[in-house]
A protein has these predicted regions:
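Short amphipathic alpha-helical surface micro-motifs
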Residues: 1-2, 11-14, 114, 160-163
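S-adenosyl-L-methionine-dependent methyltransferase catalytic module, highlighting the catalytic core
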Residues: 59-64, 68-74, 78-183
Length: 184
């Protein structure tokens, strides 16, 4: 079974081909250094997992990545995508939801981000994010690429049997993530 962890960063998953675009990791199971906005050297893929990767591509590069993913997957293969939920972020910002904003600031930004706007913009720009994804946009693009059974899930809720292994408890990720699964 060919399982890919695309845009893995430091999240190396045993049993997966872990693909990132940074220095290799000595402790990796299998680690490839590939610019996924340009290359997609895989075929006959059973599982694609990408956690907080798609937002690091421009809109057009993200669409191309989704198309290439679809073409590389076997019929019946599954893809799970986690991205910051732009709609959720906009709502929390407009509602001045300090509990949400402070939880993110404490997990990822630090005390230099005291205001609602600084936290919101810190999420958008401080981590190399190039695109914001909401459910409607991601669902539309996945459908356009040919994916089926597109559904919104929760963190740690998946058709993947090993989801507790893939997504260990992480309050920051759980707080802000739009989780989507789809099939070829």
């Amino acid at each position: 079974m060919l399982k890919l962890n695309l845009g893995c960063g430091g999240n190396i998953l045993p049993g997966f081909i872990n693909v990132g675009w940074e220095d290799g990791h000595a402790d990796s199971d299998i680690y490839l250094n590939v610019d996924l906005s340009k290359d997609f050297p895989f075929q006959d893929v059973d599982v694609i997992y990408n956690c907080h990767f798609l937002e690091h591509l421009s809109y057009q590069d993200g669409v191309n990545f989704l198309k290439k993913s679809y073409m590389a997957m076997k019929d019946g293969a599954i893809m799970r995508i986690l991205v910051p939920d732009l709609e959720l972020w906009c709502l929390k910002y407009l509602q001045h939801d300090r509990e949400f904003l402070d939880a993110y600031r404490n997990a990822y930004l630090g005390p230099d981000y005291p205001t609602d706007a600084s936290i919101f913009m810190g999420m958008l720009h401080n981590h190399g994010h190039k695109m914001g994804w909401d459910w409607d946009t991601l669902r539309f693009m996945l459908d356009w690429c040919g994916f089926k059974n597109i559904r919104k899930t929760n963190y740690l809720e998946s058709d993947l049997e090993d989801i507790n292994f893939l997504e260990p408890v992480n309050p920051g990720r759980e707080l802000e993530s739009l989780c989507v699964e789809c099939y070829k």
